[in-house]
Structure formats: structure tokens, C-alpha cells
């Protein structure tokens, strides 16, 4: 699958595009990175979405130079709820819609920091569905009552996302009667869907930090995401 570049307001952005086999058109999905950036895991996630019938693109939000400045800017944008990173994600959506292989429906999926971006963008009326996995809620959650459909997954043992986040998200979406599937898994922490391929001896650090990959919960979350996208992006 090819690396690409696409136009955005500030400059061109690199990214990774995964295309399904067979004949399109297909719905699109913008895949939003976690704080680690364009990892092998992110490419694998993008490939999985393509294998499930989605024209999937992961923008490299750290792809501009100088890289350290770009990283700081992206992380700040995540917490501020505005900035060039959001413009890049909207530009990625526009790039997919302009692709003749796309049906015109586009969803979002994000993990950790990426899920935070998803939750902010979900209420802006430009995406058709959003999958936010263990993300921080926006500072102002009320716009989420006007969100696109949301599927979200959290770990009860998460040491980064505050306890009660899943319930707060459920409540604000319910107020707006937003289609939703919110689930908190009791036995996992942060990043339980991210399989970074960390060597075995180092995995104890993941477990202590409660950031370890857990296949049963990850696969359950994936099936919920794919089912939700089939319903709302078809």
C-alpha cells in the first residue's frame, strides 16, 4: 500500500493509504494516530480497515519539518481543540471524498490522542461516524450532543483517561439521541488495542503502566467498530 501526500491549508501532508481489493467505490475512513505517530501498528490498523472494505488513510501528523516542532504543535492542538492538526484531518477527509473510489461517506477512527481528535471532530458535521478508543473528552463536551454516530471503547484500569469518562460520553450522546455504542472493558487499561510489537522482556513495563495489548478485548472492540461502520457508513 502506498505512501501518499495530500494538500492541507498549511502545506502538503504525508500519509499512508490502504485500498481494498476488488472494485469500489468504498466508504472512506481517516485513521488518526496516537502520540507515537506513524508506527507499524498504525499502518496495520489502516490495512485492517482496507481489508474490511474501507478506503483508509492515516495522515502523518508529525510529517512536517522540523519534526520536533510538528510534534509539539500536534500535541498542543489535541489539548486545545484547534490547530493545524485538525485542519490536516479535515483535509484528509476532503482528499478521500475527492477520490473516485470513495462513496462520499467518511468515518474516523482514533486511538489515545487520536481518539481525542476524533471526539472534537465528531460534532463538526463533516464525518459520518466516529470510533474513539480510550480518548480524553474535549474540554467542552456539550457539542457532542450534536455528534455523528459514535462507537467508543475504554479500559476500566486506564491510568491516563479518568474514571467515569465512558459514562460521561454516554450521557452527553444520550442527551442528543446520538446513535452510539460505548463500552468500558473491566480488565484492561490504556492502549489495549495497540499492538506495538514490544519485545517480551520489556512488556512488563506495559503491564505495570496498564498499557498492554489485550487480544480478547481488542478483537471485541474491533468487531463493534466494524459492525457500527457497516451500519453508518454504508
For each predicted feature, which ranges?
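Primarily recognizes the serine-hydrolase "nucleophile elbow" in alpha/beta-hydrolase
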Residues: 90-147
